[in-house]
Amino acid sequence: MSRFPRVYAESTIARMNKKLALPQETMSLLYDYFEAFANLYQLLPLKDAYKIISRQNKGLITLDEFIAFSEIARHEDHFYYILAKDELYLNAPKEKPIDREIVHSCLVDIDYEDYYNMADHQAGKPLKILPKQELLKYKEEMYIADTTYVRAMTNFLRTRLKMSEDEINYTISDFILIITCDDKPFDAVSKMLDRKNILMTKSQLEDFIKLFTDLSNNTRMPQNRGFTPLELSANRGGQKVINSISFGPNITAAFKSGEADIEEYRKGILMSELPEKFKMDMLRQLSQIEGKNTTPKKVGRNDPCPCGSGKKY
């Protein structure tokens, strides 16, 4: 198992390009596709890459020309690699060039664990093929699709949290990065907001949870081979969804110091329209912050209703 393919000298690449003799316009389009594949899927077999390109550009390139191009790209310096299984696994048999994969550098630059995890996540899932115009937008490293859910979150950050336009752009980018890269996006985003010392009222927090859940479930994921979680759920009849959120240390400290009213938050959670899993998890955390037993106390016949209305239960 070798580390990475060697980067060839410019003179060698020039000779390979001259031998291939494709028009510059075609070469540029192929590079755009490979960059888009690396960003959108992070891991994509060359066979699938050729299928997409051929389907969207009839007669553009033959299979032999595609393989020759991939050999050139394999030995250039990009943010992705063209790798074979025998370069990723011990004792793997040597593969034909068309059996190699486009692999984003983030999966293999430190070690191969991220690659193995991505391969496991993608296994058995169908491939989402976007229309050509939309697909090629992903050649930009941090392209963010202009969806209803992105616009809704942007509006929340602008009008409810009073962020500047620069802060909004950075924050949305961070959210998308967390959603696509983290196994527990709500925990990660809670820690991110905590680091930035962003505290929300109970109303803001309730709205944020809904918006972030929608954003998460409607963002294209490399793990899902380009599908959003909701698309894949509809396609396969079920998909893991987010069902919890953790309070960060600054928010916890605000509760303990009295800066944030824990009882008001509790009432807001109970009266909210959040999913029950969210409610129960957040109430459990509030009880832990207070130092109480997390086991709910049995409510008696004449005890006040836990909704905070003051009525008898």
Language-model region placement:
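Acidic/negatively charged segments and metal-coordination signatures
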Residues: 1-313
